[in-house]
């Protein structure tokens, strides 16, 4: 039956909502026939993919529409076209059947599909005898979706997609295109308006900014050599392992030149040996996903599944992770499921409606960052995010995710005034949809990737952030492995900024943290957030003249490495960078020529080595049994001392003298009589100190030892018997 003229016009204009109903091979009253749009052709002959001639087509419309009878059943066809003495072949995408199946439809609709990154987006596959790319995108409210790219001159009329109405997914298999092809989606909204071209939410690769197209790409192909590393972390309890995290912005750790970026392979050659020599156990990268704006540091991503093109092809990141693992170093990435930017090529009003976000700005707009908040009440949005967490664990072997801005997800009134937010169904401020999403994400990654860990950046007193989220657990439990201890960071930095003479009045800024230190599995974070936006570097937060600043910083690091909790330090602070961090420039590595800065670097290196080699300092980081106060109330002298311990391990005493006053004969309570070896002293000359100490050891008798306490210093004493 010949379609009406209006349908043909719509087809040729690229506005027909169901091009598969008209194009390809169809059964007619006189047998099978083929219909194709072949712009520029004068003649066309249909062939099977196996090389069998099926029939000749005639041009029935001057705009390039061909029709003709063909032999055989419905099957993929290839057209041999001629015009002006030229010949070319076109494999007809509309002659192929769908790639997604009923099971995909069911799982996508249910929100339980845990392999979406194999199905959605662009995938190079072989389908019904042809090689090409399968495209699939979720746009349930769109009137029409087309793939446009450098393979079809960005012409929306060439490849309109098939709609799977039950799930709102549009798909098409386009034969004879390969990898590294730029593409976007042209979406016509429900109101008939044409939206800005959209990047693929599931794209595996993207163009280098300022270009914004997605790129067709194979999944990373790696001959992984990290089995031993992964087996180790799968077999242990991370809470009882040493974890010292070096937080890195990959674009500014070092730079090849002012405007450029090192590739992942170049970073691997430089960063991995440095981290290993420094004794850090983990590297945590600020977000590595594609993002358009450098000053966002990656936290406003438009390509959650695509490693940023700034650092070379995606395979380079996989090689970096593999190399780190072979060196015994774990790799964490910052992950941003809380919000996304308003760039027009991104997720904003993706199909002409508030699809990934909320329609109401009181729910869907983030006032702090001028970004949009994911709608965690939509199962498709939750699936998109949960699958992304699984994707990084599976495809790139990352060891964990540091989840950004969790507090902003948990509360509907976060950073909002009265009248700017909507209570939940119970009248409260909790965002229970976000809670359920975080639980689902943690269950998914912990359930399928042994040894994986998640860390929450959560700045409130929400209970149970790092408590299990199994069925029957308290509703508030989120299921994270760890939580950042923001209280420790705020209180201790406030204390260290005070003049030593005033610290006696603020003793609780150090002691109070132990009231809650074991309520969660904590990471102690000295992160990038503390050295930007006018806050100054950690060195410049310390009180006193230059000598005292360095002494204070060494003492502070000693306190932190001796304190219960895993450790995190932002790049540059391990050698006391003086300037604030900026993503636009490399760290000031030349500072290491100065003895004071090199001394700090050695101190951090040795802290890491002692921390990792002494179970007393890490095996009970998250349990109160691993901590005992020795001196808690000497506010007048601003001295603190505690014992770190673990079953079967030699205990370690940590002593902090937070004034410049030297104490030559300080009575230190110790639980075991005998020799205690001075394993670390921040005032040692090797670290830039004055060299005051205890000549390597002290002896405890009748429950105490008399020790020498250097000025503005931290000591660690290990019991030897």
From Swiss-Prot:
Keyword set includes Aminoacyl-tRNA synthetase: no
UniProt catalytic activity: Transfers a segment of a (1->4)-alpha-D-glucan chain to a primary hydroxy group in a similar glucan chain
One GO process term, biological-process aspect: glycogen biosynthetic process
Species in which this protein is naturally found: Novosphingobium aromaticivorans (strain ATCC 700278 / DSM 12444 / CCUG 56034 / CIP 105152 / NBRC 16084 / F199)
Quaternary structure and partners: Monomer.
Keyword entries, A-Z: Carbohydrate metabolism, Glycogen biosynthesis, Glycogen metabolism, Glycosyltransferase, Transferase
Active site annotation, chain numbering: 404 (nucleophile), 457 (proton donor)
Top-level taxon in the UniProt lineage: Bacteria
Disulfide feature: none
CDD domains: AmyAc_Glg_BE (cd11322), E_set_GBE_prok_N (cd02855)
PANTHER family: 1,4-ALPHA-GLUCAN-BRANCHING ENZYME
The protein's name: 1,4-alpha-glucan branching enzyme GlgB
């Amino acid at each position: 039956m010949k379609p009406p003229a209006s349908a043909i016009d719509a087809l040729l204009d690229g506005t027909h909502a169901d091009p598969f109903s008209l194009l390809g091979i169809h059964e007619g009253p006189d047998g099978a026939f083929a219909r194709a749009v072949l712009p520029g052709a004068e003649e066309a002959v249909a062939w099977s993919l196996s090389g069998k001639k099926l029939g000749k087509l005639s041009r029935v419309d001057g705009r390039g529409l061909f029709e003709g009878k063909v032999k055989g059943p419905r099957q993929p066809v290839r057209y041999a076209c001629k015009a002006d003495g030229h010949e070319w072949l076109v494999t007809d995408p509309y002659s192929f059947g769908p790639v997604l199946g009923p099971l995909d439809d069911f799982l996508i609709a249910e929100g339980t599909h845990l392999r979406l990154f194999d199905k959605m987006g662009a995938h190079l596959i072989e389908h019904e005898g042809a090689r090409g790319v399968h495209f699939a995108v979720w746009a349930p409210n769109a009137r029409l979706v087309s793939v446009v790219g450098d393979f079809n001159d960005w012409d929306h009329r060439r490849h309109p997609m098939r709609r799977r109405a039950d799930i709102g997914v549009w798909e098409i298999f386009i034969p004879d295109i390969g990898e590294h092809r730029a593409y976007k989606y042209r979406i016509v909204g429900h109101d008939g308006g044409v939206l800005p071209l959209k990047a693929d939410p599931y794209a595996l690769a993207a163009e280098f900014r300022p270009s914004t197209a997605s790129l067709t790409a194979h999944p990373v192909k790696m001959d992984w050599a990290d089995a031993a590393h992964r087996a180790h972390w799968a077999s242990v309890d991370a809470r009882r392992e040493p974890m010292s995290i070096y937080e890195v912005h990959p674009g500014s750790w070092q730079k090849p030149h002012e405007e450029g970026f090192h590739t992942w392979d170049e970073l691997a050659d430089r960063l991995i040996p440095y981290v290993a020599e420094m004794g850090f156990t983990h590297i945590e990268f600020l977000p590595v996903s594609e993002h358009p704006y450098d000053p966002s540091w990656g936290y406003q991503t438009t390509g959650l599944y695509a490693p940023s093109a700034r650092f070379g092809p995606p395979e380079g990141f996989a090689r970096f992770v593999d190399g780190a693992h072979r060196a015994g170093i774990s790799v964490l990435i910052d992950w941003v499921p809380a919000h996304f930017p308003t760039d027009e090529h991104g997720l904003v009003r993706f199909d002409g409606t508030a699809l990934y976000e909320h329609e109401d700005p009181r729910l869907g707009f983030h006032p702090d960052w001028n970004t949009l908040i994911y709608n965690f009440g939509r199962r498709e949005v939750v699936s998109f995010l949960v699958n992304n967490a699984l994707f990084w664990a599976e495809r790139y072997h990352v060891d964990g995710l540091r989840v950004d801005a969790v507090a902003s997800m948990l509360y509907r009134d976060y950073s909002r005034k009265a009248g700017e937010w909507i209570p939940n169904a119970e009248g409260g401020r909790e965002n229970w949809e976000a809670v359920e999403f975080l639980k689902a994400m943690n269950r998914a990654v912990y359930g399928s990737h042994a040894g994986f860990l998640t860390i929450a950046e959560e700045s409130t007193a929400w209970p149970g952030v790092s408590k299990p989220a199994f069925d029957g657990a308290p509703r508030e439990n989120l299921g994270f492995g760890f939580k950042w201890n923001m209280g420790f960071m705020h209180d201790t930095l406030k204390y260290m900024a005070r003049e030593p003479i005033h610290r006696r009045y603020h003793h609780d800024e150090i002691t109070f943290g132990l009231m809650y230190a074991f309520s969660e599995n904590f990471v102690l974070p000295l992160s990038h957030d503390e050295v930007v936006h006018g806050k100054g570097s950690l060195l410049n937060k310390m009180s006193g003249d230059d000598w005292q600043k360095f002494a204070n910083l060494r003492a502070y690091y000693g306190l932190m490495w001796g304190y219960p909790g895993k450790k995190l330090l932002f790049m540059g602070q391990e050698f006391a960078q003086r300037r604030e961090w900026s993503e636009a420039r490399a760290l000031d590595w030349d500072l290491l020529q100065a003895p004071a800065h090199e001394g700090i670097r050695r101190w951090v290196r040795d802290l890491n080595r002692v921390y990792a080699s002494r179970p007393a300092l890490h095996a009970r980081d998250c349990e109160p049994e691993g901590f005992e106060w020795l001196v808690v109330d000497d506010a007048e002298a601003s001295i603190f001392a505690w014992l770190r311990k673990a079953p079967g391990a030699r205990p370690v005493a940590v002593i902090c003298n937070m004034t410049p006053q030297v104490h030559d004969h300080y009575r230190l309570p110790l639980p075991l009589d005998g020799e205690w070896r001075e394993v670390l002293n921040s005032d040692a000359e090797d670290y830039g100190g004055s060299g005051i100490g205890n000549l390597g050891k002290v002896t405890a008798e009748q429950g105490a030892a008399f020790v020498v306490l250097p000025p503005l210093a931290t000591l660690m004493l290990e019991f030897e018997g």
